[in-house]
């Protein structure tokens, strides 16, 4: 997918070097089509890395996508240069009068805290409330998915005895579902979290359906039947080395964490991790953009409503 981003954004060079089609504003204006407007609320600490990962996955179908990066005002990232944030990010207050075809709410390393204790919780709930009338389809990832299920449906998260970390096999519950179309009977996705949501709680909500799950990692994809809200409990956007970097970070902090499962060759942390989820991740993000956003969003973006 031709993705429209500033040429100065680090992802522009990274993706161009990977032969992914990116374009600047002047090139985009020569294409007489309405681009999909996608906002990304980036709550990850390493924002540039998260940008690269998500933009890579938004670049795989033949539609033009215009991306707007959003940061919280109530909490300023400590791990991303302020110059980068000032140049490429905007605040919710600056875009709340706009409509978007899609919104991605990322994960964040705050899952062991109560939702209400998180510095930017009130701001996040305001954004999620706004998304119901101003965004056609919202994709929530990992902690963002837990936060979305809690806010919209009062579904609780539960602390695990040990952190789930690794790459796990998953199956599809409905082979005809749009979001999982094209996936193999068994496919792989990374998970990295200390908490979970329970299947029985989701099954109580008639508006929701579980589209994919795993014996080891539990629920993966939950979606509303109208596909206006999507929840990924894992991290399909992760790069080859993301789990490795998180594992090393946790060890340096003195956390008692296990080696990520099904990831390192022979569990050797000095080996190059096996990248076994790239194909399935491309399919999943492509399906969201195509079936949940492009095929159903109004041509006139101002017609988006609840």
Swiss-Prot record:
It catalyses: L-homoserine + acetyl-CoA = O-acetyl-L-homoserine + CoA. Its EC number is 2.3.1.31. The record marks 192 as: Important for substrate specificity. Pathway: Amino-acid biosynthesis; L-methionine biosynthesis via de novo pathway; O-acetyl-L-homoserine from L-homoserine: step 1/1. Pfam families: HTS. Its main location: cytoplasm. The record marks 111 as: Important for acyl-CoA specificity. It is an enzyme of class 2 (transferase). GO terms for cellular component: cytoplasm. Transfers an acetyl group from acetyl-CoA to L-homoserine, forming acetyl-L-homoserine. PANTHER family: HOMOSERINE O-SUCCINYLTRANSFERASE (PTHR20919:SF0). This is Homoserine O-acetyltransferase. It comes from Clostridium botulinum (strain Eklund 17B / Type B). The gene is metAA.
């Amino acid at each position: 997918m031709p993705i429209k981003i500033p040429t100065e954004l680090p992802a522009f060079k990274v993706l161009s070097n990977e032969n992914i089609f990116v374009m600047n504003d002047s090139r985009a204006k020569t294409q007489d089509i309405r681009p999909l407007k996608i906002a990304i609320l980036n709550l990850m600490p390493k924002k540039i890395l998260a940008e690269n990962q998500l933009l890579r996955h938004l670049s795989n179908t033949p539609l033009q996508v215009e991306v707007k990066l959003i940061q919280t005002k109530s909490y300023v990232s400590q791990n991303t240069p302020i110059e980068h944030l000032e140049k490429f990010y905007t605040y919710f207050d600056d875009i709340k009068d706009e409509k978007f075809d899609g919104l991605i709410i990322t994960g964040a390393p705050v899952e062991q805290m109560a939702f209400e204790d998180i510095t930017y919780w009130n701001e996040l709930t305001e954004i999620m409330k706004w998304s119901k009338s101003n965004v056609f389809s919202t994709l929530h990832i990992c902690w963002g998915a837990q936060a979305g299920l809690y806010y919209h449906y009062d579904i609780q998260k539960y602390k695990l005895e040990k952190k789930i970390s690794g790459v796990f096999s998953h199956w599809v519950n409905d082979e005809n579902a749009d979001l999982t179309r094209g996936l193999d009977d068994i496919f792989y996705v990374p998970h990295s979290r200390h908490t979970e949501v329970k299947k029985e709680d989701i099954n109580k909500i008639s508006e929701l359906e579980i589209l994919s799950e795993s014996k080891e990692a539990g629920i993966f994809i939950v979606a509303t039947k109208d596909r206006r809200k999507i929840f990924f409990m894992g991290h399909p956007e992760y790069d080859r080395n993301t789990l490795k970097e998180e594992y090393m970070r946790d060890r340096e902090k003195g956390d008692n964490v296990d080696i990520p499962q099904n990831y390192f060759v022979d569990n050797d942390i000095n080996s190059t991790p096996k990248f076994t989820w790239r194909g399935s991740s491309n399919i999943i993000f492509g399906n969201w953009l195509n079936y949940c956003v492009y095929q159903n969003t109004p041509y006139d973006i101002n017609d988006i409503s609840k």
